């Protein structure tokens, strides 16, 4: 167990360093390159939309589970797994909203209320606690959501780890290639979501049906 947490800590620190490198060196030229190569390609925007699925269904799923529990439903096995998924996504997107406001990063492209962006205005940077949708690129919400799902199912359904990794990878690739987000945004979202999903499994679920850790 200690070895697993040690390895996870090492990987998290490595990703944090990589995120910093992206912000300082990679994000700007990569976004400009993606814009030239794939500007507004529907294929990449479609991949990015994978991350919208858990964003749309997590909170309603918890409400439905609560109502079902009120009427006598007692989840077992897979039921607790999907409750853990919905809870992880809900917590993760709450955290990412706070971080978006705290970091105040501008977007690669202009998409709302003439927000300043790298591609349209040459604006690139962080304006902490600026507020507004135009200053909320970091971290990526779509990547955070799909990574939170993966963070639970990676241990709960380990035989499908290839699928969870693929879904996160496709979402992240679509966001970066479609210049919806910078690479650093999706790496930060992936780290936040996955760690939140993993941490959710430590919550006190009923012992006999506790999601695998």
Which residues does each predicted region cover?
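Membrane-embedded catalytic cores of phosphoryl/pyrophosphoryl-handling enzymes
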Residues: 2-13, 119-213
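Alpha-helical transmembrane spans of integral membrane proteins, capturing the lipid-embedded, hydrophobic core
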Residues: 12-20, 57, 85-93, 186, ...
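Transmembrane alpha-helical segments of multi-pass membrane transport proteins and ion-pumping complexes
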Residues: 28, 93-97, 101, 194-201
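Membrane-helix interface segments
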Residues: 41, 76-81, 157-163
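Hydrophobic, aromatic-rich transmembrane alpha-helices
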Residues: 62-72, 146-154
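Interfacial segments of alpha-helical transmembrane regions
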Residues: 65-102
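Aromatic-anchored segments of alpha-helical transmembrane domains
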Residues: 17-24, 89-97, 168-180
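N-terminal transmembrane-helix/juxtamembrane module of multi-pass inner/ER membrane proteins
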Residues: 1-65, 100-119, 125, 129-130
């Amino acid at each position: 167990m200690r070895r697993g947490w040690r390895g996870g800590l090492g990987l998290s620190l490595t990703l944090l360093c990589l995120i910093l490198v992206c912000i300082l060196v990679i994000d700007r030229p990569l976004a400009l390159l993606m814009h030239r190569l794939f500007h507004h390609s529907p294929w990449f925007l479609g991949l990015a939309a994978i991350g919208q699925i858990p964003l749309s269904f997590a909170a309603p799923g918890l409400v439905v589970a609560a109502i079902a529990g009120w009427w006598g439903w007692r989840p077992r096995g897979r039921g607790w797994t999907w409750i853990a998924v919905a809870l992880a996504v809900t917590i993760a997107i709450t955290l990412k909203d706070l971080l978006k406001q705290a970091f105040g990063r501008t977007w690669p492209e202009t998409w709302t209320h003439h927000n300043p962006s790298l591609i349209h205005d040459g604006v690139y940077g962080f304006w902490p606690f600026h507020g507004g949708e135009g200053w909320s690129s970091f971290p990526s919400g779509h990547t955070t959501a799909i990574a939170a799902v993966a963070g639970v199912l990676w241990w709960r359904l380990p035989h499908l780890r290839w699928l969870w990794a693929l879904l996160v990878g496709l979402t992240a690739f679509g966001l970066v290639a479609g210049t919806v987000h910078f690479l650093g945004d999706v790496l930060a979202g992936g780290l936040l979501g996955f760690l939140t999903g993993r941490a959710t499994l430590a919550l006190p679920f009923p012992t006999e049906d506790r999601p695998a850790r």
